[in-house]
Curated annotation (Swiss-Prot):
GO terms for cellular component: cytosol. The keyword Transport does not apply. The gene is murB. This is UDP-N-acetylenolpyruvoylglucosamine reductase. Its main location: cytoplasm. InterPro entries: FAD-bd_PCMH, FAD-bd_PCMH-like_sf, FAD-bd_PCMH_sub1, FAD-bd_PCMH_sub2, MurB, MurB_C, MurB_C_sf, Oxid_FAD_bind_N.
Length: 307
């Protein structure tokens, strides 16, 4: 078992733990151990951990809901920080201003906003992620996306600089892309400006309809990461994959979902290697058949550089 390097000012509950399985912190339920793992309960604890990792010159990364991650079976070096305890949000029904910590589940925020008569996040009710992850990936569904309603984010750099604020304009948003994916920045919180004064019952009907649509057209009963590939607009990744007859195709415990071809599910006993091999196979087959390179939405950690 590794020995904790250097000196860390221990804040209650955040002493890094060695060799913690990351499979329990990803929605695919695969992945090896983190060399060091911690789950802070406050922004101050998070800052302490990031500063410690920087001082030790060790790799550092954050994990939200783990719904957009594929982690190598061999695990990850350095410090992995789980953001799930950093939850909380404030909503102003009069102005429409919503502030939420990075670990707040985006479906919870969607429901709270609807209950407060705030229109804008109904699309997010079925997104299996956190506010932080949504701002990084520009998560979206049902014709809406994070960038439509985000006003700003508060971030800290992994080199310890910050916190500081970035506006939506500074984040350079595009389809499933943002500046945050290219920088060593960790989202601490986000501010949204929603549309106030709407009827709760009407918003609730919309959120219920959106959630029903997602649960009936996507394989929610099995572990997955959500959509694996970005849509090569105006085409749909799922349709390109389905056209090749890959629905139901299996590699080990990984399967292209028979319900939605842009989902790879863990039918039991899958490894990260199985899923990674499936991703590569789909990319190769679609490229050969359609002349289109599919780019994953999912972030692969611990693997060689991939498209």
């Amino acid at each position: 078992m590794p020995t904790l390097p250097g000196r860390l000012t221990i804040v209650k509950g955040i002493k890094p733990q060695p060799l913690v399985s990351l499979a329990n912190f990803t929605s695919w339920r695969v992945g090896g151990p983190a060399e060091w793992f911690a789950s802070p309960s406050s922004v101050e604890e998070l800052q302490t951990l990031i500063a410690w990792a920087y001082e030790q010159k060790m790799p550092c990364r954050v994990i939200g809901a783990g719904s957009n991650l594929l982690i190598n079976d061999a695990g990850l070096p350095g410090l992995s920080i789980c953001m799930r305890k950093l939850q909380g949000s404030d909503l102003d029904p009069k102005t429409g201003i919503v502030e939420a910590l990075a670990g707040e589940p985006i479906p919870n925020l969607s429901k709270r906003a609807a209950k407060a008569g705030l229109h804008g996040l109904e699309w997010a009710v079925g997104i299996p992620g956190t506010v932080g992850g949504a701002t990084v990936m520009n998560a979206g569904a049902q014709g809406g996306c994070t960038a439509d309603w985000l006003e700003s984010v508060q971030v800290i750099d992994l080199n310890g600089e910050g916190p500081f604020e970035l506006s939506r304009q500074e984040l350079d948003y595009a389809y499933r892309k943002s500046l945050l994916q290219e920088k060593t920045l960790v989202v601490l919180s986000a501010r949204f400006r929603l549309d106030p004064g709407h009827d709760y019952k009407e918003l609730n009907q919309i959120t219920h309809k959106n959630l029903t649509h997602r649960t009936t057209t996507q394989p929610y009963q099995l572990p997955s990461c959500g959509s694996v590939f970005r849509n090569p607009e105006p085409l749909k990744a799922g349709r390109l994959i389905e056209a090749l007859g890959l629905k139901g195709h299996r590699i080990g415990g990984a399967e292209v979902s028979p319900i939605h071809a842009n989902f790879i599910v863990n039918i039991g006993g899958a490894t990260a290697a199985d899923i990674n091999q499936m991703i590569n196979l789909i990319q190769q087959r679609v490229q050969m058949a359609h002349g289109v390179m599919l780019h994953p939405e999912v972030k692969r950690l611990g693997f060689e550089a991939t498209a």
